[in-house]
Curated annotation (Swiss-Prot):
It comes from Idiomarina loihiensis (strain ATCC BAA-735 / DSM 15497 / L2-TR). This is GTP cyclohydrolase FolE2. Belongs to the GTP cyclohydrolase IV family. Pathway: Cofactor biosynthesis; 7,8-dihydroneopterin triphosphate biosynthesis; 7,8-dihydroneopterin triphosphate from GTP: step 1/1. The keyword Membrane does not apply.
């Protein structure tokens, strides 16, 4: 009876020879503690992709269990930070040192933040989809952070058309009157007869991806989310009372946006942030008027960097 279990990956050569760019696993479910700048560490439930290259064309395969166990060790013994991510990628390569010299990992998770309402200051949770990606190649670490931030966009064209209809309704209602009593006007403006039209608006999402500088240790997740919401002015809310809804309506009216406007606001904001070497962004306006979406994509324009 054999006493040693066979190791096909080590003991067998590839049937068809060829180097492979990436081999590994996806959809690994892992709980993690994430170190984000400016806030305490917090737990997340992540789905992970873990890969190494296979540079030896004759090698049958990689040792996936080694990658899995290294990831599990980080999950149970440490936190996800710049240093631990770099060490994890180094360990991936070291565990395959004869057949691999590149490593890749990606963490996808929802990052929950407490958000105050606009006026009442009630609080609620908002979940932001986040991805952290690391690649180690030729001794260099490349880190990337991406977030999705929902917001409201109100169409400038639709707002102008609605205002025109209100003007027409006013002219019809008070035709022939040289003067109109202020109290009557006030009451009329507060009625559906007075406000005969409203502009269309829709939930929208900003997808933002940034290349992190080498000096980053704790990930600037909250900083990036705050910057996006601050530039757009109309983030989707959590807890909402009537006074908050009214303020949200005011903010939408004062921040009318085509997708081009939203994209340029974010472009301007991200250009001011020195801890991001590069960025790529896409704004998606999920139109309530049209059956299609309105989309704008732009980048920082770094030579050799992200492309649209």
């Amino acid at each position: 009876m054999p006493t040693v279990m066979p190791d096909v990956a080590n003991q067998t050569q590839a049937q068809t020879e060829g180097a492979l760019d990436w081999v590994g696993m996806s959809n690994i479910e892992v709980p993690l503690m994430v170190a984000a700048a400016g806030v305490p560490e917090r737990p997340v439930a992540a789905k992970v992709e873990a890969f190494v290259n296979l540079k030896n064309p004759k090698t049958k395969g990689i040792h996936m269990s080694r990658l899995y166990l290294l990831l599990d060790k980080m999950s149970t013994e440490g936190e996800l930070s710049h240093d631990t991510l770099k060490q994890l990628l180094n360990d991936f390569i070291e565990s395959h040192k004869d057949i691999s010299d590149q490593a890749f990992i990606k963490f996808d998770f929802d990052y929950h933040l407490r958000r105050k309402s606009l006026i009442s200051k009630k609080q609620g949770w908002k979940a932001y989809p986040v991805s952290l990606t690391g690649r180690y190649d030729a001794g260099q670490l490349k880190l990337e952070l991406s977030v999705d931030v929902p917001y409201s966009s109100t169409c400038p064209c639709s707002a102008a058309l609605a205002r025109q209809l209100i003007q027409d309704a006013f002219s019809e209602k008070f035709a022939g009157q040289e003067q109109v009593d202020a109290s009557i006007m006030h009451e009329w403006l507060g009625s559906t007869e007075g406000i005969v039209a409203t502009p269309h608006s829709q939930r929208s999402v900003a997808e933002v991806k940034v290349a992190l500088s080498d000096s980053v240790n704790d990930f600037p997740i909250v900083e990036l989310i705050d910057a996006i919401e601050g530039a757009l002015k109309t983030p989707v809310q959590a807890a909402v009372k009537r006074e908050d809804e009214q303020e949200f309506a005011r903010l939408n009216g004062q921040n009318l946006m085509f997708c081009e406007d939203a994209s340029r606001r974010l472009q301007h904001q991200l250009n001011q942030m020195s801890n991001f070497r590069d960025f790529w962004l896409r704004v998606n306006h999920y139109e309530s008027l049209h059956a299609h979406d309105a989309v704008s994509v732009t980048t920082k324009g770094v030579p050799g960097g992200y492309s649209a």
